[in-house]
Amino acid sequence: MGKKQVRPPRALPPVPSAIQDDIPLSRPKKKKPRTKTPLASASSEGLVQTAVHRPPEGSEPPTKDSIEHQEAPVQRRQKKTRLPLELETTLTQKKTASPSLLPNENGINVEPDEEPVIQKPRRKTKKTQPAELHYANELGVEDEDIITDEQSSPEQQSVFTAPTGISQPVGKVFVEKSRRFQAADRAELIKTTEKIDVSMDMKPSWTTRDVALSVHRAFRMIGVFSHGFLAGCAVWNIVVIYVLAGDELSDLSNLLQQYKTLAYPFQSLLYLLLALSTVSAFDRIDFAKTSVAIRNFLALDPRALASFLYFTALVLSLSQQMTSDRIHLYTPSSVNGSLWAEGIEEQVLQPWIVVNLVVAVLVGLSWLFLSYRPGMDLSEELMFSSDVEEYPDKGIKVSS
């Protein structure tokens, strides 16, 4: 009774495997390999427990309380293995903060020396929740971002609404002249622009096609006039010849004396009118299609007949040009150096009179043929009309 009862030393609870992984006992530099089988880890835990928790000799066997303390950590270890890694680390820190008391030789409970605890470096895992909260805060709606209709309505009216007042024109305007802007009166500027517009309307632009078409139509009008004038001149010429020659060409010397002054002028005029009339008649025929022109002539087309008769009259008139020269140079046979000998007047003049008669008849018939349809011109339709098609049947086939 007088002696204080000495309590037996308390055995340390077994350290769980998860805690041993994080906190080494005596060798801080030694790291436990991660790739271990469950059997090897269990055997190592058993050896550590026997080495650490062996009671000293001469001590009493462990009591019921100590046994309960030894069994309790086992159950806790089984539960802790199911917990996540963060909770295990917090539990180990709590246990290390409150170590159990160890009895010394005198039987007094003494706190064990704190062993250096070296924690294993842990990998930092990315925390997704703070990031989500950060983005959620950024996407939050603030009061400044909310715009009411009352605030936006005056701004929209000031920017987009048109002025209600009527704009008044300014008296002076600035016009760029020689790379400089000069002030000018609006009324004078409007007058000058109106004059320019009127002049542009009065002078339409002409193309080469328009000029060619106008020239062609003007020449056709001249040709129509030459046809009638040539027919009249030819008839007048033959009438004058027969009047001056007398009955049955009995007075040819009188014809030579009276007609020699008219031979050159009249023959020149007749030749000019025949040339114009022949070209004008040919313009009315489509010579681009030779077969069509020959077919029209054989079918007695008035335009084809007129062109042929004019060409024949022109050739006959040129064939009698030498006789006209001799008539112009007529002198009596009694005069020295005369081109007309005695008795040859009838031999020279008779063919000339017949040719002039034929020319008058041909010219008159041609004028009658062309006067039937004076506006008909196939050359104009071919050259200047875009609606004329060379092969209408083929065009229909291609379009189909």
UniProtKB/Swiss-Prot annotation:
Basic and acidic residues compositional bias, start-end: 54-71
Membrane disposition: Multi-pass membrane protein
Region (Disordered), start-end ranges: 1-112
Annotated positions of the Phosphoserine modification: S17, S43
Compositional bias per record (Low complexity), positions renumbered to this chain: 84-96
Any one Gene Ontology cellular component term annotated for this protein: membrane
Subcellular location: Membrane; Cell projection, Cilium
Domain of life assignment: Eukaryota
UniProt KW Transmembrane keyword: yes
Keywords in alphabetical order: Cell projection, Cilium, Cilium biogenesis/degradation, Membrane, Phosphoprotein, Transmembrane, Transmembrane helix
Gene Ontology BP term (one): cilium assembly
Regions crossing the membrane: 221-241, 262-282, 297-317, 352-372
InterPro entries, per database record: TMEM237
Protein purpose: Component of the transition zone in primary cilia. Required for ciliogenesis.
Family: Belongs to the TMEM237 family.
Quaternary organization: Part of the tectonic-like complex (also named B9 complex). Interacts with TMEM107.
Protein name, entry field: Transmembrane protein 237
UniProt organism field: Bos taurus (Bovine)
